[in-house]
A protein has these predicted regions:
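Rossmann-fold NAD(P)-binding glycine/threonine-rich loop
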Residues: 92-143
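Short amphipathic alpha-helical segments
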Residues: 16-18, 39-40, 76-81, 100-101, ...
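NAD(P)+-binding Rossmann beta1-loop-alpha1 motif at the extreme N-terminus of oxidoreductases
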Residues: 1-44
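Rossmann-like NAD(P)-binding element
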Residues: 45-100, 119
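Short, hinge-like loop/turn segments at secondary-structure boundaries
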Residues: 43-47, 83, 106-107, 142-145
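Nucleotide donor/acceptor-binding cores
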Residues: 1, 86, 147
């Protein structure tokens, strides 16, 4: 299965490493595929994944996993290009950092999943993989790592 992981931070990196180790074709979609952060992740995974632009990876994937920081989520979705008929697993949380610490940006009258579905018109969005910290998302004990 070809999995595009949009965002190569803590959550995306942990999920991608687990799935690559299980033999899935993991493609990390990032703003700058040549950035040291993306290249370091590939080295850590051991060459079992690749990195490209958000549009490239979304176009070639069977399933898209959205793992961006909330403030970058709308831009990331708009960068995917044509996603009609695609399946998106939304692992985001609508959190922002402010002067008083971390705060919920939305979720009082509309959910983050509803916002993502609105931005990802034509795709099927499933809210998933967003309730555990990234430290719990990888390794042999993680249920989703066995996909």
């Amino acid at each position: 299965m070809k999995l595009a992981i949009i965002g190569a931070g803590n959550v995306g990196g942990a999920l991608g490493a687990s799935w690559a180790q299980k033999g899935h074709d993991v493609l990390f979609g990032v703003r700058d595929p040549t950035a040291e952060k993306a290249q370091a992740l590939l080295r850590a995974i051991g060459g079992k994944a690749s990195v490209g632009t958000v549009a490239e990876t979304a176009a070639s994937a069977d399933i898209i996993v959205l793992s961006t920081p909330w403030p970058a989520t709308e831009t990331a979705i708009r960068s995917m290009g044509n996603i009609k008929g695609k399946i998106i697993l939304d692992a985001t949380n609508p959190l922002t950092r402010g002067p008083d610490g971390i705060a919920l940006e939305i979720g009082h009258s509309i959910s983050a999943g509803e916002k993502v579905q609105g931005w990802a018109s034509g795709a099927s969005v499933f809210k998933a993989l967003n309730t555990n910290g990234f430290g719990n998302t990888g390794g042999a004990a993680a249920d989703h790592a066995n996909w």
